[in-house]
């Protein structure tokens, strides 16, 4: 990710602080570099992060090979992309598969 990215990169080590401890809802994208659908949804998530940044943090966690296995295991992520919305430190919504911007915003609307 570039430095001007609207999304936040998280790891197993930073997940508790950056996601579970966040004062606003966090949409976490579980992705991998080799995942084609993950690459398709990435620009959509950047747009949502830029437009909804006052209401929502969009975080990305790379689950490629051995990267960050604990978080993916803890939240039973078995296919990617999987996006999980956390509110007040708890998962409240799970979205599996690449979706367009309108579909993602509809999925998130009740939480924002």
Swiss-Prot record:
> What residue stretches are annotated with the Thioredoxin domain?
2-112
Please provide the Gene Ontology terms (biological process) for this protein.
cell redox homeostasis
Q: Name one Pfam family in it.
A: Thioredoxin
- S-S bonds: 35-38
Question: Is Nucleus a UniProt keyword of this protein?
Answer: no
**Among the entry's GO cellular component annotations, what is one?**
cytosol
Keyword rRNA-binding tagged? no
Which keywords has UniProt assigned to this entry?
Disulfide bond, Electron transport, Redox-active center, Transport
Q: Which GO terms describe its molecular function?
A: protein-disulfide reductase activity
Q: Which NCBIfam families match?
A: thioredoxin
Annotated function:
Participates in various redox reactions through the reversible oxidation of its active center dithiol to a disulfide and catalyzes dithiol-disulfide exchange reactions.
Q: Which family does it belong to?
A: Belongs to the thioredoxin family.
PANTHER family from the entry?
GEO12009P1
What is this protein identified as? Thioredoxin
Q: Give the classification, highest ranks.
A: Bacteria, Bacillati, Actinomycetota, Actinomycetes, Mycobacteriales
